């Protein structure tokens, strides 16, 4: 299992949680961004800088992630694309995206885009807060626990 992070706008708190999880669970975490990222020295964490451009980081993640991996993103179209490949995905707020939920989330996102394009001021997401941090940490821990149980039961390694 690898964890792929859409890191361009990823909150620092999420990166900290991921660093601790990488050490604890000894799982590779790759931060993908179109800017230079500094990561703590660790055999489990690395950063990949992709060229600037629309969805270049997303394309790298889609090309790299395989079933059994986990993608961390707030980008609903990216989540939909990796879920379509059989890759698990979750948001920075701990929302798990799966085949059953991603279609609805994509429809809602598209509707909001249309409203914005039509001049409707719908605001944006709330600031990332303590409750979001806890929800993400709990969702990530649950995914890692499932992975550990699956591997311990002789199942396919890396299934989230």
Curated annotation (Swiss-Prot):
Domain of life: Bacteria
InterPro entries: UPF0178
Cross-referenced Pfam families: DUF188
Organism expressing this protein natively: Bordetella bronchiseptica (strain ATCC BAA-588 / NCTC 13252 / RB50) (Alcaligenes bronchisepticus)
Family: Belongs to the UPF0178 family.
Protein name in UniProt: UPF0178 protein BB1267
Transmembrane portions of the chain: none
């Amino acid at each position: 299992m690898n964890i792929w992070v859409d890191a361009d706008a990823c909150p620092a708190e999420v990166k900290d949680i991921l660093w601790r999880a990488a050490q604890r669970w000894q799982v590779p975490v790759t931060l993908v961004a179109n800017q230079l990222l500094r990561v703590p020295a660790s055999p489990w964490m690395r950063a990949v800088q992709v060229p600037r451009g629309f969805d270049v980081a997303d394309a790298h993640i889609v090309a790299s992630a395989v079933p059994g991996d986990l993608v961390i993103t707030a980008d609903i179209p990216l989540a939909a694309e990796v879920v379509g490949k059989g890759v698990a995905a979750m948001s920075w707020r701990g929302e798990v995206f799966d085949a059953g939920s991603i279609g609805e989330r994509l429809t809602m996102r598209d509707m909001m885009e249309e409203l914005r394009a039509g001049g409707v001021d719908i605001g944006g997401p709330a600031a990332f807060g303590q409750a979001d941090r806890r929800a993400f940490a709990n969702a990530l821990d649950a995914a890692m626990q499932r992975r550990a149980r699956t591997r311990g039961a002789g199942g396919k390694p890396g299934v989230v």
